[in-house]
Amino acid sequence: MTYCLRIADLPTNERPRERLMTHGAKILATAELIAILLGTGQGPGKLSAVGLGQFILSELGKHQRDPLAVLREVSPAELMLISGVGPAKATSILAAIELGKRAFQSRPNDGTLIDSPLAAAATLSQDLMWQTQERFAVVLLDVKNRLLGTQVITIGTATETLASPRDIFREVIRQGATRAIVAHNHPSGNLEPSQEDIELTRQLLAGAQLLGIPVLDHLILGNGNHQSLREITTLWDEHPQGD
């Protein structure tokens, strides 16, 4: 795609809006999604909307930063420092970002069946997903895996949080839950479990066997994604939960 052409001059099947309507939003490059929000282009060299979208990402990605991570927290003033971005374009981008956050953070109602890592992650998104400090939380379930509630157990630093099996099970028992899913966030967005994550999970599963309160999963959340330790480790084979 040529970034200096007007979108109106592109073949129909190369225009971002038409591509979205035909193929869905997932197929579009990030610059194309931004172009739809911008509506028009300009900036240095009279760029097309797609070209301006690419230029915005390039400017946000300076100093080896992830442009999407910057975009999540950018202010209107910071966006308007980029050539070609005025108040109208900046507010359109920021409104779309906030709408996406709110849609992702919308949590199920109590009583909802939590039957997958995705469903569990959705219940914890508001508490964990976009936080800049590590947090450890628990999803509280009844015997049929229906949601009773969620609870943040601890709040740590940007790189670590501390949670003990005793504190976690105390909260589960206090709230009358019979099953639980534990989770914490990695503000960096790296969802790989640390050795400490693995060891804590092992302790929780062993404790769950003694107490008769199954721990169904341990999730790591961050930057809009999640990872299930149950899916990527053998810990549940080593410590069956009877679920």
Curated annotation (Swiss-Prot):
Species name: Nostoc punctiforme (strain ATCC 29133 / PCC 73102)
UniProt xrefs under PROSITE patterns: MPN (PS50249), UPF0758 (PS01302)
NCBIfam families per record: PRK00024.1, radc
Gene3D superfamilies per record: Cytidine Deaminase, domain 2
Residue stretches making up the MPN domain: 113-235
A Pfam family of this chain: RadC
Lineage per the UniProt record: Bacteria, Bacillati, Cyanobacteriota, Cyanophyceae, Nostocales
Binding site for Zn(2+): H184, H186, D197
GO MF annotation: an example: metal ion binding
Similarity field: Belongs to the UPF0758 family.
Gene Ontology biological process terms in this record: proteolysis
Coiled coil: none
Motif position, JAMM motif: 184-197
Organism domain of life: Bacteria
Keywords of the record: Hydrolase, Metal-binding, Metalloprotease, Protease, Zinc
Cited CDD domains: MPN_DUF2466 (cd08071)
Name of the protein described by the UniProt record: UPF0758 protein Npun_R6401
